[in-house]
């Protein structure tokens, strides 16, 4: 089962709010997810991002691949750097 970390759209029309979820790559964008690991609100200024860093690192170490947008969010929060350090220290 290929697992991805991606955004699940919530909110109302023209007012998007996203959950950062772990889901099977074959499931629909807003379909069933395995676990929620954070939220992303692009509407407010500054952008609001909340991520459970421990869960994100755990899922990536198990082989979950983040989508391009989630990878950018993780990079801004410093999670990708921690993941690479953790991966290279083994």
UniProtKB/Swiss-Prot annotation:
Keywords of the record, alphabetical order, are: Ribonucleoprotein, Ribosomal protein
Name the InterPro entries on file: Ribosomal_bS16, Ribosomal_bS16_dom_sf
**What's in the GO CC field?**
cytoplasm; small ribosomal subunit
GO terms under biological process? translation
Could you give a GO molecular-function term held by this entry?
structural constituent of ribosome
Keyword Ribonucleoprotein: yes or no? yes
Is Ribosomal protein there in the keyword field?
Answer: yes
Specify the superkingdom.
Bacteria
Q: Which NCBIfam families match?
A: S16
The text of the family note is: Belongs to the bacterial ribosomal protein bS16 family.
The identity of this protein, by name, is Small ribosomal subunit protein bS16
Source species: Oceanobacillus iheyensis (strain DSM 14371 / CIP 107618 / JCM 11309 / KCTC 3954 / HTE831)
């Amino acid at each position: 089962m290929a697992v991805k970390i991606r955004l699940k759209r919530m909110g109302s029309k023209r007012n998007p709010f996203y959950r950062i979820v772990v889901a099977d790559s074959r499931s629909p964008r807003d379909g069933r997810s395995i676990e929620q690991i954070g939220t992303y609100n692009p509407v407010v200024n500054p952008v609001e991002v909340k991520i459970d860093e421990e869960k994100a690192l755990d899922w990536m170490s198990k082989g979950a691949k983040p989508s391009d947008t989630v990878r950018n969010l993780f990079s801004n929060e410093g999670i990708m750097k921690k993941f690479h350090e953790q991966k290279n220290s083994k």
